[in-house]
Every structure is written in C-alpha cells, then in structure tokens.
Amino acid sequence: MKRREVLNTAAIATATTALVSCTQTNTSSVQAGLPNVRWRMTTSWPKSLGTFIGAETVAKRVAEMTNGRFKITPFAAGELVPGLQVLDAVQAGTVECGHTSSYYYIGKSPALAFATSVPFGLNAQQQYAWLYQGGGLAAIQKIYANFNVINFPAGSTGAQMGGWFKKEIKSVSDLKGLKMRIPGLGGQVMSRLGVNVQVLPGGEIYLALDRGAIDAAEWVGPYDDEKLGLNKAAQFYYYPGWWEPGPTLDVLVNLNAWNRLPKEYQEIFKTATVEANLTMLNQYDALNGEALTRLLAGGTKLVPYSQEIMQAAQKISFDIFEENASKDAAFKQVYEQWKAFRKQIFAWNRVNELSYENFASSSQ
C-alpha cells in the first residue's frame, strides 16, 4: 500500500473512531437526562406459549434501547389479573400496560374486533397494511381513547387453524348444540350456526376439552396447540381458521402513563412493538409447519371445512357486520373504511400473490 493510502486510511479510521465516540457520548448525555421508569405488563397468555413472545419482545427491546432506564416486566395471565381482564386493569391504572387480543373486549365496543381479526377478513400482511397505511390504527386508537387507553399492534400469529373437534363436522347440522371455545365475532358466527359458544383463556382450554366441558376449541395453530396438548383431547383438526385469517395482538397502554413518558421513550416503545410484530409472525411461520408434521405423525386427522359450512359462515359474518354497522356509529366508521380497503387489496393480491401461490403450491 502506498504511503498516501496508508495516511488516508489512518485518517478515516481516526475520524470514524472520533465520530462513534462522539455519538456514544451524545447518546449517553441525552439518556442521562431521562428518568428511570418501571412498568408492569399483564397479559392474556401463559408464559409457555408463543403469544407471550410479543410481550417479551417489547419489554426486552425497550430496556435495550434505553440502556435499562425504561424497564417493563411482563406477567402471565392470572399472575396480576385474569387473562380476559387486561383492558379493565389497564384502564383502571392497576397496571401501566397489557398484552392481549382486542377482540376479547367486543362487549365494550364491537369495533375492537377489527384490531385483532374478523371472519373472512385480512391476512397478516394485509392487516398490517390496513393498520399502518390504511388508517386502521388511527381508527382503533380513537375507540380506545374512550377507555383512557392507547393501543399498539405487537404481534401476529398469521392465519390460524379451524379448531379441534372430538367428532367430524361435515355439515352445518353437525354444529348444532356443540359446545366450542371460540371468542370474538367468530364466536358470534358460530353461535348463529347453532354452536354453544364458550370463551376461555388459553390456559384453561385443555382441561375443558379433555374433561368434556366443551366439545371443540380453537386456539392458534399447530405450534401453540401442540404445546397446550389439544391433540391429546381431540382428534379432528379443521382448517382454515376463517374467523382469524390474520390476527394481530395489541399492547394496551394507560393513557395517563403514556403521557407521562418522555417523547424519546414513546418512540422507543412504538419501535419495539413493530419489532414484536415481525418477531412473532416470523416465529409462527417457521414453527407451525414443523409442529403440524409432528401432529399428523401422532395420529391427528387434518380435515377441511365443507363448502356448505364455509359459505354459510361467510354469509352470516357479513350479516353481522352490517347489523353492527346499523346500530353502532364507531363500528360503522371502522367497518366502512376496512371494507373499502379489503376490496382494493384483495383485487391487487389476486394478481400479485394468489396467482403465484396457487401455481407454486399446486406444482409441488
């Protein structure tokens, strides 16, 4: 190497070192003026399931990006409050935040279902596009503001399965009188199909199914369902999970606690929730296929829903949407926006995604 090149290289290295040192000093100086914050995050999940990773990711990344000044401790369902009472606890300020599914709270506002997933709705990719680019998140946050809460998407399981059944379900008539664990608007659809709907937190599903308190149950997909042991309590595994094609989980934050955070911490928190979305979805996409292979090898019977059931469920779903829109202004506002976005993105994805997937999957 020529002497001039050596000198230039040395100069660049020196400048780079100085710049990094300056940046680190400036960052430390900025963070030195920021407060130490300690939050508690209740959740709707057992720690053993993949859904808990959304809460863990947010907590881990917030701590890392603030050099430990802002720490959030996630708790499993039941450790602080019951799994289906996260919104109540956050609203009351019992905890600063919680990780949950918004559709658990449609009794408070039916439109909250759109924050998670609705029957025959958007897949995970489409859901994110609607939330972040189609105005969906702003619309949902407007509803949550009525509860003194702000929400941020923080995880997705991807398209879910259609549930575990102790007997085969070949037609709509086979659903009548069946006791099934299924929440959200999907539960309302099943109810109209004759199902006796139950809503249970994840940690209670296996025992209820195993002991005959329920005849069927849906949770997430092969990876988590296997962990819960649902394959040991029922044999028939149905697909697709038409009621949750792209469910998003949320972090709910008490607005008073949120407004007390420095702007820097708010931005870090939001960044961590976006990372939680990617982390959880990637995990489920990678692990569900492996788990399904194990389940099938162990005797699980994989069965598609009949066209009769699918068509009946789809019709009832949109009947319920229209009924809710006619009597609930917030639901109507979100639904009309969502419906327009769904129509547009479905048309586009038929061209760019579905055409390829249909060919590629059929040619394997």
From Swiss-Prot:
Amino-acid positions noted as binding Na(+) in the UniProt annotation, renumbered to this chain: Q160, E218, W219, E244
Organism, as annotated: Nostoc sp. (strain PCC 7120 / SAG 25.82 / UTEX 2576)
Protein name, as recorded: Monocarboxylate 2-oxoacid-binding periplasmic protein all3028
One Pfam family it belongs to: DctP
GO cellular component, one term: tripartite ATP-independent periplasmic transporter complex
GO BP terms, alphabetized: organic acid transport
Subunit structure: Homodimer. The complex comprises the extracytoplasmic solute receptor protein all3028, and the two putative transmembrane proteins alr3026 and alr3027.
Subcellular location: Periplasm
Keywords, alphabetical: Metal-binding, Periplasm, Signal, Sodium, Transport
Similarity comment text for this entry: Belongs to the bacterial solute-binding protein 7 family.
Positions that bind substrate: Y103, Y104, Q160, R181
InterPro entries registered for this protein in UniProt: DctP_fam, SBP_TakP-like, TakP/all3028, TRAP_DctP_sf
GO MF entries: metal ion binding; organic acid binding; organic acid transmembrane transporter activity; protein homodimerization activity
Function: Part of the tripartite ATP-independent periplasmic (TRAP) transport system involved in the uptake of monocarboxylate 2-oxoacids. This protein specifically binds monocarboxylate 2-oxoacids including pyruvate, 2-oxobutyrate, 2-oxovalerate, 2-oxoisovalerate, 2-oxoisocaproate and 2-oxo-3-methylvalerate. Is not able to bind mannitol.
Summary of the knockout phenotype: Impaired pyruvate uptake.
Regulation: Pyruvate uptake inhibited by 2-oxobutyrate, 2-oxovalerate, 2-oxoisovalerate, 2-oxoisocaproate and 2-oxo-3-methylvalerate.
